């Protein structure tokens, strides 16, 4: 074998080894060749070169290539921002999580559970796969979910962990159930995957074949890649059947629905919140303490339900929208009689609606035809989806706050009615009586105590009523002790004016106290304790005599009484002469 043929053989072996390694190679013209095939001319030249045994070098290398395991090229999958989830679904799921984190029931679910900080060391042994809203949001922002079902599974895992560890009746379990209801309500409007644009069948096949990943995805409500391939290969006549059902579509009377949306947003304005909040969400018979509501109202309606129907394009005419608004007001007026706070609020909101509704423009047939020609049946863009989602979420998020506000307002109204009733029963107080009449002296106290002994039954009843008004804790007692020394200044002055100076205060409906003329002479002298006791004993004896009783009294006591009377009379006369 010549040296020239030997060199060619070595070169051919080198080229084959490079080709087996899968790296690019250069031919004689410096053109890049892929590892999948050889140049036809090069293969023919190699087949002509034989070794000393008569075997073809190209045949030997071909056998080696066939015996080696073939490396299948990995399919190149083009993902959107690193995720298989379409952008509308990605954006909607992220908006759901962020809205849930803003609700008041999301506090236990915002961050991962810390068993040490929360003093629940058995949590990791019970909950094997913890999950929280913060982790789900992080996975959404890093595009770790390929289909919405993976996101839904993580949300359901979070709620299942809550119910597993806390139960459904505990405070945390109740918060989890409320949060799950909001999530499931918002999930119903999850948009479907974007459908491929209308294109020739061959191009759609090539595109779907090059971008479809070979792995199997979970079943979900969203159309998968295989479904999109089937839709692209289906006849054009069957294409409307595979359009997403849950996706809102533009109505041909879009201008009318836009006006309805404007009116509804007007009713949600802050300036009408004081009388519009009872209509923001459906009536809760338990929270509003009206268990017979659904027995009276057969078709309940509220603004949040109307907003939801408007977002789903369930209204086709203005009359349908107006009918639901009027139904809401009629329900209010049917259940709440005239004069009640909710009835008055309903009338105020109805006037606002009528004012806005009368200003609606005229939608003639020619205008609708032009709109039908100008507008397409394309799906909502992402901005409109997010706006509709946020409006729905804001309504749902304000549900509990509005209910609490309504209950608080009704309680305040009840307290105001009770206070008004009590004010009618009370008489106006006179303040600053201490400054007006001066300090309370010991002589004033003795005078009041002495005059109270001569009050009639009606006057004593009036004094007791004054004490009950000034001292509420005495209202439930039948017997009231008049303690002159421990009275408040305003109470003392009021009773003192009533008993001792009935003519000085014309506002008090008091009759003058009938007092005997003799005790007036003793005004300048204060009796001692012994004299007061003796006087009480004498009065008791007089009462017994009037009642027909005879009390055994010793002559010594009678003499002592006569002596004390003469002494007291002499002292009083001497004080008057002085």
UniProtKB/Swiss-Prot annotation:
Pfam families: BET (PF17035), Bromodomain (PF00439). GO terms for biological process: chromatin remodeling; DNA repair-dependent chromatin remodeling; regulation of DNA-templated transcription; transcription initiation-coupled chromatin remodeling. Residues 22-36, 550-563 have a biased composition (Polar residues). Residues 430-510 form the NET domain. Residues 1-89, 192-254, 504-578 are annotated as: Disordered. The modification Phosphothreonine is found at residue 225. It is found in: Nucleus. The keyword Transcription regulation applies. This is SWR1 complex bromodomain subunit bdf1.
């Amino acid at each position: 074998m010549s040296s020239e043929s030997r060199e060619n053989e070595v070169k051919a072996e080198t080229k084959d080894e490079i080709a087996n390694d899968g790296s690019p190679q250069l031919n004689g013209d410096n053109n890049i060749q892929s590892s999948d095939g050889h140049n036809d001319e090069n293969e023919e030249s190699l087949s002509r070169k034989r070794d000393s045994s008569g075997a073809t070098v190209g045949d030997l290398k071909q056998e080696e290539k066939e015996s080696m395991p073939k490396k299948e090229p990995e399919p190149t999958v083009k993902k959107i921002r690193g995720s298989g989830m379409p952008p509308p679904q990605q954006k909607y799921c992220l908006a759901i999580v962020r809205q849930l984190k803003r609700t008041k029931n999301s506090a236990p679910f915002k961050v991962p559970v810390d068993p040490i900080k929360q003093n629940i060391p058995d949590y990791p042994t019970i909950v094997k796969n913890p999950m929280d809203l913060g982790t789900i949001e992080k996975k959404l922002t890093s595009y770790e979910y390929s289909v919405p079902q993976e996101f839904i599974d993580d949300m359901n895992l979070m709620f299942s962990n809550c119910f597993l560890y806390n139960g459904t009746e505990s405070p945390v379990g109740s918060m989890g159930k409320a949060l799950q209801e909001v999530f499931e309500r918002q999930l119903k409007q999850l948009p479907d995957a974007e459908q491929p644009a209308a294109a020739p069948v061959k191009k759609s096949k090539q595109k779907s074949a090059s971008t479809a990943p070979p792995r199997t995805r979970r079943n979900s409500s969203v159309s998968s890649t295989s479904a999109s391939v089937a839709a692209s290969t289906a006849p054009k006549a069957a294409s409307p059947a595979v359009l997403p059902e849950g996706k809102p579509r533009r109505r041909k009377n879009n201008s009318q629905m836009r006006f309805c949306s404007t009116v509804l947003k007007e009713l949600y304005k802050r300036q009408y919140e004081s009388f519009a909040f009872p209509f923001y969400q459906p009536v809760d018979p338990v929270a509003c303490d009206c268990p017979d509501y659904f027995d009276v109202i057969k078709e309940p309606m509220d603004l949040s339900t109307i907003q939801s129907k408007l977002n789903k394009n369930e209204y086709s005419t203005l009359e349908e929208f107006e009918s639901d608004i009027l139904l809401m007001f009629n329900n209010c007026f049917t259940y709440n009689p005239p004069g009640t706070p909710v009835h008055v609020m309903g009338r105020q909101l109805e006037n606002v609606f009528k004012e806005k509704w009368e200003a609606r423009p005229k939608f003639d047939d020619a205008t609708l035809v032009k709109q039908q020609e100008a507008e397409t049946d394309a799906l909502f863009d992402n901005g409109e989806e997010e706006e509709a989602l946020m409006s729905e979420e804001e309504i749902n998020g304000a549900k509990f706050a509005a209910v609490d506000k309504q209950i608080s307002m009704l309680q305040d109204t009840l307290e105001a009615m009770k206070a008004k009733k009590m004010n009618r029963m009370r008489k106006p107080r006179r303040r600053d009586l201490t400054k007006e009449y001066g300090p309370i002296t010991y002589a004033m106290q003795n005078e009041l105590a002495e005059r109270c002994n001569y009050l009639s039954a009606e006057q004593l009843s009036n004094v007791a009523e004054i004490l009950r008004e000034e001292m509420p804790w005495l209202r439930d007692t039948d017997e009231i002790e008049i303690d002159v020394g421990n009275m408040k200044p305003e109470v003392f002055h009021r009773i003192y004016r009533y008993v001792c100076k009935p003519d000085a205060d014309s506002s008090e409906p008091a009759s003058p106290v009938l007092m005997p003329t003799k005790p007036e002479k003793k005004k300048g002298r204060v009796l001692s304790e012994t004299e007061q006791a003796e006087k009480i004993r004498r009065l008791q004896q007089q009462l017994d005599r009037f009642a027909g009783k005879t009390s055994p009294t010793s002559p010594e006591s009678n003499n002592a009484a006569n002596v004390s009377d003469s002494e007291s009379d002499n002292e009083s006369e001497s004080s008057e002469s002085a």
